[in-house]
Design a protein with these regions (language model features):
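N-terminal beta1-alpha1-beta2 module of alpha/beta enzyme domains
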Residues: 1-59, 63
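Flexible, glycine-rich active-site loops centered on histidine and acidic residues
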Residues: 2-15, 72-134
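Active-site nucleophile and cofactor-binding loops and adjacent substrate-binding regions
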Residues: 42-45, 66-74
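Residues at structural and domain junctions
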Residues: 38-41, 65, 107, 114
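Ser/Thr-centric signal marking residues that sit
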Residues: 59, 66, 85
Length: 134
């Protein structure tokens, strides 16, 4: 049987904390393999890693993942520490999906140049891996 995961789009104005917890519990109860959240800066969704921390506290088995985290907008050392902490509180159930974004509006919102985002993402992923292993 294939692994099935469900994504939580997390629109901030409509989301309540109990929605996140209930969604995570339902995913697990239905036998889903994973629960995923999205990341956007220039959109009204909630911060995905914090939502996954809530889901970690409400579940025991499902994997928790980002689909995808805009990993080159925040500082990579900060992302690495948050993901390591999430891995700790979830007993290693984290899958980190990182992208470099296709929407210039996310970059404009935080005043980071849109150009060269791919090469920046490669450098930042390397830094995070180093922080997790050294």
């Amino acid at each position: 049987m294939p692994n099935i995961g469900l994504a939580w789009v997390n629109p901030a104005p409509l989301t309540k904390p109990e929605h996140v917890v209930n969604f995570a519990k339902q995913c697990e109860a239905m036998g889903c393999h994973s629960m995923w959240t999205i990341d956007r800066v220039a959109y009204d969704n909630l911060e995905p890693l914090t939502l996954l921390a809530m889901a970690a506290g409400a579940t025991q088995r499902i994997r928790l993942g980002t689909s995808v985290l805009l990993g080159n907008l925040p500082h990579p050392s900060h992302v690495a520490k948050i993901v390591a902490t999430l891995g700790f509180i979830s007993n290693g159930r984290v899958t980190l999906g990182i992208g470099f974004g296709s929407r210039e509006s996310d970059y404009k919102a935080v005043e980071i140049p849109f150009e060269h985002r791919g090469s920046r993402a490669v450098e930042q992923i390397a830094l995070m891996k180093r922080l997790w292993t050294e």
